[in-house]
């Protein structure tokens, strides 16, 4: 398909653009750093690294000839020490003893290593040495800044590193957001396809690699749409054929039942009466089967929902009576729990009644003698909950996936005479027409559980 125009960008081009932008920004930042440092030096805001060394050299002649060196003669940017000429021991000063070891090696002209970028000037006096210690780093000219901040060199480097991190983060975030936007375009398209919402117009990114993926997704969408349309037509034809066949079968079944009923009224021996009873029973089963087929063939196409204000509580009460009658003499316990049922809500009473009754009759049929069917009906402000549990064999793994499909019968775990795989199918279709949700599961004890949630509307 393609977007059909020249000059589309590529990911490589975007990457090169990112690298060039980043490099230019870093170079500009470095030049700005140099410019600001130059301004700071020229305006006297900071002193160069050799400033203290020059000041010490200027001070040396005075300290060499003065009678006594005192602390007030030494600038606050320097430390000093007075050493005895013979013993090399400190007699006064502020230089730490550890640093004096380097000074002694320097006086004795022995090799030493200075790790701390400190300079030392040894001034020889009559009976002593005066040693000045100073920093070989650029520093602030302001005593206040020197007191509360590290030296100017370290402070400016820290600020530079912070600015580098900020610039890199801003540029990287900008380009990352541009790429994220393109990825989001892909996510939107894949989400539409996943939800089978295929009537959408794709938005291209104008980046070759992304647009190639979008082209592939569009081709997949078109193929999926064609497949779904073919499947829909096939399903529609199947339902039409099922409905037509069911109507055709009704006529001979009605004739069979009518003749069987006439036979039952005639003089028959016991064996003939038994056979006639079998014919009528089988005819009733087939008639019920056909009735369900006709309704299922209309569920999604012809069957419409008629919402009217009805009592949810009354619906539940009717279900209690109907399932109790359906149970008959079967030795099972039906536990019905009702909570906060709304007096009125807009529902299709007949449709919902039949759907929920299908679920209940399934539970009764699959529950063995002595078992229990538990029903919980409850409303909150927006949802009608209807949960049914039984103590039968539960759904198999395949049954959990396919039990609501037409004609599916889970023979391995929930086989029951008289079931044709249509009850849960109708229930699910009816729940869907109410914009509700029907889910299947198994209880911890191993029985089946059907959960229905119906959104309620009061208006």
Swiss-Prot record:
SUPFAM superfamilies: ATPase domain of HSP90 chaperone/DNA topoisomerase II/histidine kinase, Homodimeric domain of signal transducing histidine kinase. GO terms for molecular function: ATP binding; phosphorelay sensor kinase activity. Residues 1-18, 177-459 are cytoplasmic. It comes from the Bacteria. The keyword Transferase applies. It is a multi-pass membrane protein. InterPro entries: Bact_Sensor_His_Kinase (IPR050398), HATPase_C_sf (IPR036890), His_kinase_dom (IPR005467), HisK_dim/P_dom (IPR003661), HisK_dim/P_sf (IPR036097), Sig_transdc_His_kin/Pase_MprB (IPR008358), SpaK_NisK-like_HATPase (IPR044082). It catalyses: ATP + protein L-histidine = ADP + protein N-phospho-L-histidine. Pfam families: HATPase_c, HisKA. It is found in: Cell membrane. Residues 40-155 are extracellular. Keywords: ATP-binding, Cell membrane, Kinase, Membrane, Nucleotide-binding, Phosphoprotein, Transferase, Transmembrane, Transmembrane helix, Two-component regulatory system. Residues 244-458 form the Histidine kinase domain. Its EC number is 2.7.13.3. GO terms for cellular component: plasma membrane. It is an enzyme of class 2 (transferase). The modification Phosphohistidine is found at residue 247. The chain crosses the membrane at residues 19-39, 156-176. Member of the two-component regulatory system SpaK/SpaR involved in the regulation of the biosynthesis of lantibiotic subtilin. SpaK may function as a membrane-associated protein kinase that phosphorylates SpaR in response to environmental signals. This is Sensor histidine kinase SpaK. It comes from Bacillus subtilis.
